[in-house]
């Protein structure tokens, strides 16, 4: 009888365990507690997202694991993940590159891409330091919420605290400069340099297809930046330097000025920065020693081939949570037109309300998601003109002039540039 009782107890425990694991609450339900009201929207995307490629931003759990022979690689990098830094002690100018993942019209977002341009002008070197978005950072939440990570810290603690934390992880003294951009700005810059923006971002955001996941992803992003700089550096420093620098500054949020960037370029050239592509190196923090795959991102055709090999369209089609308009161009036109019409009504009686309605969408440069140049220029002008009028109604000529200057710089960038 005793043996039978023990056997029954064991059986009950096994059945209870099985029921728990088969019916385990989702992470979404676990995080929605009274003490932890902030949900991880980096995983639970809402219906209206700031992206022209929509499904490409969703990364479904997929068991695909590609070896080095299944993709076209240029080799491997076995130094990016080592803890030692060959340039330790060098004088540096550190600039954070922050890619924000936010909804259309949102005033903030999670830090989805976290990179640092660590420039050493005295020796003609640039080190791109890349940090995975899910790197552990204490944000003040219980660890069971899965919210204690770098991507959440930006929103939870603010930009200045984020920059200090970024410097700590990267083992740098400080990061005085930042350049922030969202999906729209990223798409605009990529289109400017001849890339099919949605396709390129889809590849650069992919992590499920690699054995080391997010570490390979941030390395890919850093490698893309490196190859872009190598390929177009002469354009950025040649006759059209003012057009490119001022234009890009108009697209992003930054505390840098034209003169500062121009001086950095000049010092790098004086110290033979352009002599070799190897003057740009990549460092991964926290360190993870691995053989990072080096892919060719310099050619849009290669990116298209890589997208196909990774099966990203197949993965995107499996997503059932994304809101996907049948015609994205018409959808975006409708959204922007509605914002413009409602803000225009407020301009005369309540210009501050009009500014509040326009500013978030304006700062995200949502119109850059249009593939059509005419539509992009049309809505850029409509948004800029209306925002200028609202500022002038408040007698804020300084802000109005800034909006006007940014519009002119953007037009010069896309119309006068020879890269497109």
State each model region's role.
Residues 1-4:
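Positively charged n-region of N-terminal signal peptides that target proteins for export
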Residues 6-20:
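Hydrophobic membrane-insertion alpha-helices, especially the h-region
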Residues 16-420:
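Non-catalytic, solvent-exposed segments at the cell envelope interface
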């Amino acid at each position: 009888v005793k043996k039978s009782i023990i056997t029954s107890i064991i059986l009950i425990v096994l059945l209870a365990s099985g029921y728990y694991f088969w019916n385990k609450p989702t992470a979404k339900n676990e995080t929605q507690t009274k003490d932890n009201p902030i949900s991880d929207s980096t995983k639970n995307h809402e219906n209206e997202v700031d992206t022209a490629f929509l499904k490409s931003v969703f990364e479904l759990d997929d068991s695909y694991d590609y070896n080095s022979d299944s993709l076209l690689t240029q080799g491997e990098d076995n130094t990016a993940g080592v803890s030692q830094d060959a340039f330790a002690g060098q004088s540096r100018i550190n600039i954070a590159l922050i890619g924000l993942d936010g909804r259309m019209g949102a005033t903030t977002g999670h830090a989805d891409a976290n990179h640092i341009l660590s420039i050493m002008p005295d020796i003609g070197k640039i080190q791109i330091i890349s940090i995975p978005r899910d790197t552990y950072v204490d944000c003040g939440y219980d660890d069971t919420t899965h919210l204690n990570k770098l991507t959440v810290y930006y929103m939870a603690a603010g930009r200045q605290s984020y920059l200090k934390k970024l410097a700590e992880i990267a083992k740098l003294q400080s990061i005085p400069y930042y350049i922030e951009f969202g999906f729209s700005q990223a798409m605009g810059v990529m289109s400017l340099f001849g890339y099919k923006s949605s396709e390129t971002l889809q590849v650069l955001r992919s992590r499920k297809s690699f054995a080391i996941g997010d570490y390979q992803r941030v390395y890919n992003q850093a490698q893309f930046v490196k190859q872009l700089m190598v390929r177009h550096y002469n354009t950025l420093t040649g006759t059209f330097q003012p057009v490119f620098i001022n234009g890009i500054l108009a697209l992003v949020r930054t505390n840098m000025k034209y003169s500062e960037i121009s001086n950095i370029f000049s010092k790098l050239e004086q110290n033979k920065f352009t002599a070799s592509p190897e003057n740009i190196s990549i460092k991964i923090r926290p360190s993870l020693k691995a053989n990072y795959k080096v892919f060719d991102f310099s050619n849009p055709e290669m990116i298209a081939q890589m997208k196909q090999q990774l099966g990203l369209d197949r993965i995107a089609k499996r997503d059932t949570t994304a809101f996907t308009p049948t015609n994205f161009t018409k959808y975006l036109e409708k959204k922007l037109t509605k914002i413009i019409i409602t803000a225009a009504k407020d301009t005369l009686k309540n210009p501050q309300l009009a500014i509040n309605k326009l500013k978030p969408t304006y700062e995200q440069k949502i119109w850059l998601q249009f593939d059509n140049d005419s539509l992009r220029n049309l809505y850029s002008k409509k948004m800029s003109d209306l925002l200028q009028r609202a500022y002038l109604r408040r007698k804020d000529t300084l802000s109005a002039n800034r909006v006007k200057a940014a519009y002119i710089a953007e037009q010069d960038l896309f119309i006068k540039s020879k890269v497109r």
